[in-house]
């Protein structure tokens, strides 16, 4: 069975498309939206006492319980828009980076003006996503351009020798 397309799409190698897909899933999906937004209970500005809400204002890195899901810290919209930098990297369009940064700034400003995020939420979202993009880029450069995932063989877990904690502890 063929699970991945072997040819270049838009003249971009498979490795680079896998890089962008991984940035989307890991950066915006897992780290920003699943971990920070759902585990960091910072209330949105509209929900704080200072803006006629019921919850108190909290500093960005303080993990509190004023919001259950889809909380303020960090901004998923800014994270998703920061992924445009990853796409620009694979298209080798450094001249467009200025436009990407302007777009990220405008999205951040819009989210702040709507009362959905604090300034720190948008800045930290950009920093977290940018670091993930750069780390993944450096990792993916070690893979061949014509990355063919169809040639990978699945692990046969029935042949794996499992060790218990008792086996690994010499006491």
Regions found by a protein language model. Name each.
Residues 20, 24-25, 51, 125-126:
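Alpha-helical transmembrane segments of multi-pass membrane proteins, especially transporters
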Residues 56-162:
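Membrane-embedded catalytic cores of phosphoryl/pyrophosphoryl-handling enzymes
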Residues 3-8, 35, 39-44, 95, ...:
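Membrane-interfacial segments
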Residues 39-67:
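Membrane-interface interhelical connector segments
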Residues 27, 31-32, 36-41, 89, ...:
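Membrane-water interface at transmembrane helix exits
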Residues 2-39:
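Interfacial segments of alpha-helical transmembrane regions
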Residues 34, 38, 47, 82-83, ...:
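Generic hydrophobic alpha-helical membrane-span motif
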């Amino acid at each position: 069975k063929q699970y991945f397309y072997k040819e270049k799409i838009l003249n971009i190698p498979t490795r680079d498309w896998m890089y962008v897909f991984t940035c989307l899933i890991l950066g915006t999906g897992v780290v920003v939206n699943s971990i920070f937004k759902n585990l960091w209970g910072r209330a949105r500005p509209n929900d704080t006492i200072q803006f006629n809400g019921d919850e108190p204002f909290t500093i960005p890195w303080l993990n509190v319980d004023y919001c259950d899901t889809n909380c303020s810290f960090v901004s998923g919209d800014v994270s998703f828009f920061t992924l445009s930098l990853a796409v620009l990297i694979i298209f080798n369009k450094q001249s467009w980076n200025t436009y990407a940064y302007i777009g990220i700034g405008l999205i951040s400003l819009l989210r702040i003006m709507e009362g959905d995020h604090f300034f720190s939420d948008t800045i930290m979202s950009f920093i977290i996503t940018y670091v993930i993009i750069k780390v993944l880029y450096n990792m993916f450069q070690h893979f061949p351009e014509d990355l063919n995932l169809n040639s990978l063989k699945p692990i046969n877990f029935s042949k794996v020798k499992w060790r218990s904690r008792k086996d690994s502890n010499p006491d």
